[in-house]
Amino acid sequence: MDIAKKFISEIDDKLESKSEFDKELEKIKSSFNEEYEKWSSGKQRGSSSKHGNQSTHGDSSPTRNSSGSSKKGRPKANRVETSSELPDHLIRGFINEKLFLKNFLLKQKESEEFKTLAIVGKYGVGKTTLCQAVFNDEDVKQVYFPRIWVSMYSKETKEDEDPKIDVVKRILRSLGVEDEMFKHIKTEAEEEKSIKDEAGEREEETVKEKELARLLYALHLNLIGKKYLIVLDDVWEDNEWDQRLDDEKKQQEKSHLSCGFPKGFGGKVIMTSRDERLAKAIVGEEENLQRLFPRSDAESLWEIYIDAVPTKVDDAAATNLGDAVATNAGDAVAPKVNPRYPGRYKQELMDKSCGIPLAARMLAKIEPVKVDEIGNIDRKQSF
C-alpha cells in the first residue's frame, strides 16, 4: 500500500533528541493529513456516486479542518473543533491522570475557592480525551453545574471576528444566551463610542473593547453564585488569551477574561494547550500545571492500536474469533491479536508512533491487522 509505505518510511528511524521528536511528530501530522485527505475524498466521491446526493459525516480525523491558515500563519489542519462527547472508542490508560483530575475537582467539595489547572502536552498525546473522560464522570456531574466545554477553535468563527469576543460568545451560548442579546450589546457599544466621539471626549477604548467588556459582564452575571466547571480545550496564542485567570488585581480591568469568572463559589477552569509557556501565563504556579507525556507502556499503546483497527467481522467470522472484544463502534470488532513475537511487534509500534496514542490510531487505519478466511488474525507484513 503506497500510502502506508510513504507514511511509515517517514517515521521509521528512532528519535534521538527532543527537537527531532518535535519535527518527526509534525511530519506524522502533515503526512497523514495530506494522504488521508486524498483517500477520504476519493472514498466520498465513490460513496456519492452510489448513493446519489447523500453525504457522509462524522469522521473524526484531523483532516477535516485542513484548509486555510490561522491568523499567525499556522495551518488549520493542526486544529480540530472538539466537543465534550466521549470518543467512540475505549479510553485506554490515564488511570493516574484521571485520579489526579478528579482529586483536583472533588477533594474539597465544599470549598468555595476558585481554581485553575492547565494540562499540557504534545499533539495527539490525549489531552482532550482525558478531559472528556473527567468532564463526563458521574461524580463530577453531581458537584458542578453548569459544566461548559469550549473548543478554542471553531469552524464557525468568522474571519473578521475578534477571537476574545468569539470565545466569550460561545460560552454564553452554552448558558442559553441568544444571538439577539449579542446584537444588542454590540449596538450599545457602538452608540456609546459614537456619543463620546461627537462630544469630543478623548477615549482610548475601542468599540470592540467596549463590546468585550459587556460580554464579560454578562458572563459574570450568568455564572455568579454557581459552582461551575469550564474546560477551555486547545488554547493557542491565536486566541489572544494570555492573562492569569485567578488574578484578583485584574478584576478591575473590564476586558480581562477573569472578569467573566466569578470568584468565591467553587468554580473551576481547566485548560489544555500544547504551549507550556502560555499555560503558565494563564494558570500561574507550577502546581497548577499537569504535564501529559507520550506513553512509555507498550501494552496500552498496543491496545489503542487494536481498538482503532477498522475491521468489520460478520457473525460467522466473529464465532471463529473466540477472544474478540466488541467496542463502542457498533458492528466493529477489536480483535485481541496474539502474534508469534508479541514483544517485537509492540516495540515496533512504540518506535513508529513515538508513544503518541493518536499516531498509533493513525497507523491502525492505514496498516491494520487482518482477519483471514479461517478467522486467524495476523499482521500485514509491511507494518
Swiss-Prot record:
For this protein, the record's PANTHER family field holds:
DISEASE RESISTANCE PROTEIN RP, DISEASE RESISTANCE PROTEIN RPM1
Which stretches make up the NB-ARC domain? Answer: 75-184, 207-281
Show the GO MF annotations. Answer: ADP binding; ATP binding
Q: Which organism is it from?
A: Arabidopsis thaliana
Q: Does the keyword Nucleotide-binding belong to this entry?
A: yes
Q: Which cysteines are joined by disulfide bonds?
A: none
What name does UniProt use for this protein? Probable disease resistance protein At4g19060
What keywords does the record list, in alphabetical order?
Answer: ATP-binding, Nucleotide-binding, Plant defense, Repeat
